[in-house]
């Protein structure tokens, strides 16, 4: 059972208070954002679902990320994170959508992006914001820290704080 003070619990409470829904598109977090949301009882009132778009072609075919964007910038990039969040918002029919794309490790990706480089995006009716993080080594640590950053990004938006 999660503590009520967890980031995901705070996001859940804020979504309920504001009557908004959330979805997610995950790559490097591999479904961890969705898992942490669905660990909370009653979350079906606000959580629409998620897409684990681990493969690049899924980012294109399911989320609608333009192939030209993937070719130019690669899957681990700010423009792709932005497009993933916007695609998830559209596909899942939710008010807000958060996305993660990055390099969990143990090796750099094919473009040479280092382990621990992650882009998180939040798409909302009034805009899309991206946060770039670079964190310590360890696949599990990268996944868990990235999911927490995704919840923090969402919490900040819902709380009316600066989203960065």
Descriptions of predicted regions:
Residues 3-164:
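Short alpha-helical segments enriched in small residues
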């Amino acid at each position: 059972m999660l503590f009520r003070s967890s980031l995901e619990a705070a996001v859940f409470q804020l979504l309920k208070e504001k009557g908004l829904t959330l979805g997610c598109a995950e790559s490097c977090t591999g479904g961890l954002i969705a898992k942490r949301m669905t660990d909370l009882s009653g979350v079906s009132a606000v959580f629409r679902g998620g897409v684990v778009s681990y493969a690049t072609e899924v980012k294109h075919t399911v989320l609608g990320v333009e192939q030209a964007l993937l070719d130019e910038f690669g899957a681990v990039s700010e423009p792709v994170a932005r497009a993933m969040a916007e695609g998830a918002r559209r596909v899942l029919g939710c008010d807000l959508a958060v996305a993660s794309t990055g390099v969990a490790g143990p090796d750099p990706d094919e473009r040479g992006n280092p382990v621990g480089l992650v882009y998180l995006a939040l798409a909302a009716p009034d805009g899309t914001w991206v946060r770039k993080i670079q964190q310590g080594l360890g696949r599990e640590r990268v996944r868990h820290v990235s999911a927490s950053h995704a919840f923090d990004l969402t919490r900040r938006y819902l709380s009316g704080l600066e989203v960065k």
